[in-house]
């Protein structure tokens, strides 16, 4: 949304339409013939930003991205001739935008008010800040096409901002700027094609509703490691995957999406707060600058790899719809540089409610629960922009966009239209459970209803790096499922009447639930669990289960048979060690020490069972 024309600048009256009717955020204007769908307009004397969403004859229906009080019939409407676009260039990382990419910090400094004034017209990326530009191996006379890398800007210590030729440009280089400091408006590249000369600065403008082109889509094969044990082990997502986190209020959706943005193995994070409470965004803004990530032994603030699109519930409804598109376009831009990007959308239900409100104002036919009939198609067109791709241009590189969408169905009802439409599209479903959250079991992921369709795609990765992992995961799922089946019997007849092997299943399931699936995201040792620690914990717990069952089954016929009570009484120390594996701190103890401790515990296990059977 670069600086648009003002009404006072326009000298031709034919460029004006006039307001015909106002209904909340929807304005109808007449004498608008010649305008295009999704064209940006400025409405009224306050010059509010709006977008044309319907054309009939010379009447245009406009959704306005700001408060429309004070707009009257007969006010001028200025056409700008551009679609809703975002500015792409150095300066995105670490900034906070609203739904149509207005920089909130700059607006605050300009107006020294906590509110955004009407019709504020300020560039999205700073025009005065200069960036150190280094050309790559592009010289005068080189031939370049869309997507080629021609320069580097060290935007900050975490992100190298690679400058790309815009996707539709091509030609022979006539001029490339020498290394030095430039602002985003300075011309740093000139190309010539068919006698036509084009000048390019660091800044690109791209329409948000249009996906950025790629060479081809690739199958995903690398996991998106979240640092949450239950997700990494049982329901993994891939880099370039789509995930939904539905859950009622207070189940911890926001905490999971924040944990993803803090600890996942992504290069760039785009966090879109779309219609959620303002306090949640301010919590992100308070926490993120203090958090750090260690890259190559250097500690850096996480804010350096994050951009926030804040469109909270007290901002105008229409901009909520745009904020999701703004976020995904920013993500695609960083993907084109060859980065792995994660985009968090919190929450897509509020976005769907914005669609519902605007659809209602347009008097369209409502479908299920009053949502528009095209809800599924809109959701799909958003989630389809995720994926791992081969980027346009040279040098060859791969990037990915992973989308994690939080869904807040009213009352935690998963048959809600938004949830069911989302589940038909996404490949990973992390279902949050109100009952688990009330028991203070966090992350409150219900391991019986959640699923991931990427298991098969990740088998190669596990075979190469963690060979023992896949059978362990299968065993965990079996134990948890068996425990669910046994729990009904236990409620009827009590634990004492169960078979010995079933008692072991129940106890190991309890161990898994309390000390493996549960994770305290506010503690130093457990807020992030690396994958080697996850696998090590699983190996010891399942090793204990297998050995205990083996001991019980082999001595079932003999005179001194081993029962669960015998095992529990003689192995109190080992059970305590199993449940305290999570207290190993990956930062303080380091990978080698934790692995050695886990291997030692496994040997102690084997020794203890040998002693027991003798």
From Swiss-Prot:
- What is any one GO biological process for this UniProt entry? ATP metabolic process
Q: Does the keyword ATP-binding apply?
A: yes
The way its activity is modulated is described as: ATP hydrolysis occurs at the interface between the nucleotide-binding domains of subunits A and B. ATP hydrolysis triggers a conformational change in the subunits D and F, which induces a shift of subunit d. The c-ring is subsequently rotated and results in a continuous proton translocation across the membrane.
Zinc-finger: is it a keyword of this entry?
no
InterPro entries tied to this protein:
ATP-synt_VA_C (IPR055190), ATP-synth_a_Xtn (IPR031686), ATP_synth_asu-like_sf (IPR023366), ATPase_a/bsu_AS (IPR020003), ATPase_F1/V1/A1_a/bsu_N (IPR004100), ATPase_F1/V1/A1_a/bsu_N_sf (IPR036121), ATPase_F1/V1/A1_a/bsu_nucl-bd (IPR000194), ATPase_F1/V1_b/a_C (IPR024034)
- Residues recorded as binding ATP, renumbered to this chain, are 247-254
The catalytic activity, as recorded, is: ATP + H2O + 4 H(+)(in) = ADP + phosphate + 5 H(+)(out)
Q: Name one Pfam family in it.
A: ATP-synt_ab_N
**What is the top EC class of this enzyme, as a single word?**
translocase
What PROSITE patterns is this protein classified in? ATPASE_ALPHA_BETA
- What terms describe the molecular function in GO for this protein? ATP binding; ATP hydrolysis activity; proton-transporting ATPase activity, rotational mechanism
Q: Which Gene Ontology cellular component terms are annotated?
A: lysosomal membrane; proton-transporting V-type ATPase, V1 domain
List, alphabetically, the Gene3D superfamilies matched: 2.40.30.20, 2.40.50.100, Bovine Mitochondrial F1-atpase, Atp Synthase Beta Chain, Chain D, domain 3, P-loop containing nucleotide triphosphate hydrolases
Q: What is its EC number?
A: 7.1.2.2
Q: Which UniProt keywords apply?
A: ATP-binding, Hydrogen ion transport, Ion transport, Nucleotide-binding, Translocase, Transport
What is annotated about its quaternary structure and interactions? V-ATPase is a heteromultimeric enzyme made up of two complexes: the ATP-hydrolytic V1 complex and the proton translocation V0 complex. The V1 complex consists of three catalytic AB heterodimers that form a heterohexamer, three peripheral stalks each consisting of EG heterodimers, one central rotor including subunits D and F, and the regulatory subunits C and H. The proton translocation complex V0 consists of the proton transport subunit a, a ring of proteolipid subunits c9c'', rotary subunit d, subunits e and f, and the accessory subunits VhaAC45 and ATP6AP2.
Q: State its role.
A: Catalytic subunit of the V1 complex of vacuolar(H+)-ATPase (V-ATPase), a multisubunit enzyme composed of a peripheral complex (V1) that hydrolyzes ATP and a membrane integral complex (V0) that translocates protons. V-ATPase is responsible for acidifying and maintaining the pH of intracellular compartments and in some cell types, is targeted to the plasma membrane, where it is responsible for acidifying the extracellular environment.
Q: Which family does it belong to?
A: Belongs to the ATPase alpha/beta chains family.
> Which PANTHER family is this protein grouped with?
H(+)-TRANSPORTING TWO-SECTOR ATPASE, V-TYPE PROTON ATPASE CATALYTIC SUBUNIT A
Q: What is this protein called?
A: V-type proton ATPase catalytic subunit A
Taxonomy of the source species: Eukaryota, Metazoa, Ecdysozoa, Arthropoda, Hexapoda
């Amino acid at each position: 949304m670069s600086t648009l024309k003002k009404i006072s600048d326009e000298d031709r009256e034919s460029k004006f339409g006039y307001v015909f009717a106002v209904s909340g955020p929807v304005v109808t204007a007449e004498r608008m013939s010649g305008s295009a769908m999704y064209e940006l307009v400025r409405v009224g004397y306050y010059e509010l930003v709006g977008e044309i969403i319907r054309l009939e004859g010379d009447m245009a229906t406009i959704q306005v991205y700001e408060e429309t009080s004070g707009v009257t019939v007969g006010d001028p409407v200025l056409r700008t001739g551009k679609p809703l676009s975002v500015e792409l260039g150095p300066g995105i990382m670490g900034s906070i935008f609203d739904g149509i990419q207005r920089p909130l910090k700059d607006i605050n400094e300009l107006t020294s008010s906590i509110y955004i004034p009407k019709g504020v017209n300020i560039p999205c990326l700073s025009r005065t800040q200069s960036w150190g530009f280094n050309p790559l191996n592009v010289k005068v006379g080189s031939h370049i096409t869309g997507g080629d890398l021609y320069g580097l800007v060290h935007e900050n210590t975490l992100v190298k901002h690679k400058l790309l030729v815009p996707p539709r440009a091509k030609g022979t280089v006539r001029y490339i700027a020498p290394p030095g400091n430039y602002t985003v408006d300075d011309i740093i590249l000139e190309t010539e094609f068919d006698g036509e000369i084009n000048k390019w600065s660091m800044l690109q403008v791209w329409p948000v509703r249009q996906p950025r082109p790629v060479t081809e889509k690739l199958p995903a094969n690398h996991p998106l490691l979240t640092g949450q044990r239950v997700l990494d082990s049982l329901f993994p997502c891939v880099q370039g995957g789509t995930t939904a986190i539905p859950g009622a209020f207070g189940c911890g959706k926001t905490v999971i999406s924040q944990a993803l943005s803090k600890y996942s193995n992504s290069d760039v994070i785009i966090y879109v707060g779309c219609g959620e409470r303002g306090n949640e965004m301010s919590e992100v803004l308070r926490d993120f600058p203090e958090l750090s990530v260690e890259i190559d032994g250097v500690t850096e603030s996480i804010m350096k790899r994050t951009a926030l699109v804040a469109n909270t519930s007290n901002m105008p409804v229409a901009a909520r719809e745009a904020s999701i598109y703004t976020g995904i376009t920013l993500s695609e831009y960083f993907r084109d540089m060859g980065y792995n990007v994660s985009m968090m959308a919190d929450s897509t239900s509020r976005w769907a409610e914005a669609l519902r409100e605007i659809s209602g104002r347009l008097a369209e036919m409502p479908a299920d629960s009053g949502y528009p009939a095209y809800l599924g198609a809109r959701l799909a067109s958003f989630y389809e922009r995720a994926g791992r791709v081969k980027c346009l241009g040279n040098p060859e590189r791969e990037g990915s966009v992973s989308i994690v969408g939080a869904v807040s169905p009213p009352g935690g009802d998963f048959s809600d239209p938004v949830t069911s439409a989302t589940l038909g599209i996404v490949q990973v479903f992390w279902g949050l459970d109100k009952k688990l959250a009330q028991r203070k079991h966090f992350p409150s992921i219900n391991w019986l209803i959640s699923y991931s369709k990427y298991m098969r795609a990740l088998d190669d990765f596990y075979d190469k790096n963690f060979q023992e992992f896949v059978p362990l995961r299968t065993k965990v799922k079996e134990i948890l499922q068996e425990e669910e089946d046994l729990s009904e019997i236990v409620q009827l007849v009590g634990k004492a009447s169960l078979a010995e092997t079933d008692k072991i299943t129940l106890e190991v399931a309890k161990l898994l639930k309390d000390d493996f699936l549960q994770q305290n995201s506010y503690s130093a040792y457990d807020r992030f669990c690396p994958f080697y620690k996850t696998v090590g914990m699983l190996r010891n717990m399942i090793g204990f289960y297998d050995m205990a069952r083996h001991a019980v089954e082999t001595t079932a016929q003999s005179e001194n048979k081993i029962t669960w009570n015998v095992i529990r009484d003689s192995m109190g120390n080992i059970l305590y060690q199993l449940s305290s594996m999570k207290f190993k701190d990956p930062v303080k103890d380091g990978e080698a020490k934790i692995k050695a401790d886990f291997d030692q515990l496994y040997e102690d296990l084997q020794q203890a069972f040998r002693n027991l059977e003798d």
